[in-house]
């Protein structure tokens, strides 16, 4: 769905035709009418204006907030029990907003950020070490922005700690590049933000939910005391299953990691307060 109905129809037709050659019999439809949501079990929200070079994700809040509110009203009317996956930026704030107006539990409304941030970090680790990205495990928590918290002691290559291969200085460079990964792409493309990697990240989460795979993936979830925080949406490791977000996994953090997480949470809390004031 898109406010530009014919654009959505064209993209849907293109995807449908691509799916045929991959052996899929799924029919793909597009349009602008909210009635298309009727009976949906899972809705992914990506609508909104992209940020421009030099802007933060929070800079597009005033524009994207009313867009999200309109979509949530349509979802509540046509698919009130649907699981909602928020991707629009600023994703932490908009996930919180979507949950707060949905009338549903946190298991049914959550966001995508950490899967993408983790993929970026794995890409940079593979580039730096020369090893296959398939053998790299990584984890990113916190807000989706410069305050995100890559947990480097959980990063491994083929079950070997990352610190065995890279110096602390090299690891810190990867951390900083991961935090600014979206901005790097935005600066290079000039006229648009990342789309392919976010699309793959969304597909992973949708697959986990639609097929009940019980996958552990980072998601922007509403915290209810986990990691010492409440009434906030933050990126944390979650179990995604058939009904949505089955549970949050609370990892033990050392003092430095907890301090970084708290710093990130404080920033997200300020952003949410700004949203409430609009």
Curated annotation (Swiss-Prot):
Gene3D superfamilies: Lactate dehydrogenase/glycoside hydrolase, family 4, C-terminal, NAD(P)-binding Rossmann-like Domain. This is Probable malate dehydrogenase. The active site is at 144 (proton acceptor). Keywords: NAD, Oxidoreductase, Tricarboxylic acid cycle. Belongs to the LDH/MDH superfamily. Catalyzes the reversible oxidation of malate to oxaloacetate. GO terms for biological process: lactate metabolic process; tricarboxylic acid cycle. Its EC number is 1.1.1.37. Substrate binds at residues 51, 57, 89, 120. It comes from Pseudomonas putida (strain ATCC 47054 / DSM 6125 / CFBP 8728 / NCIMB 11950 / KT2440). Pfam families: Ldh_1_C, Ldh_1_N. One of its GO terms (molecular function) is L-malate dehydrogenase (NAD+) activity. It is an enzyme of class 1 (oxidoreductase).
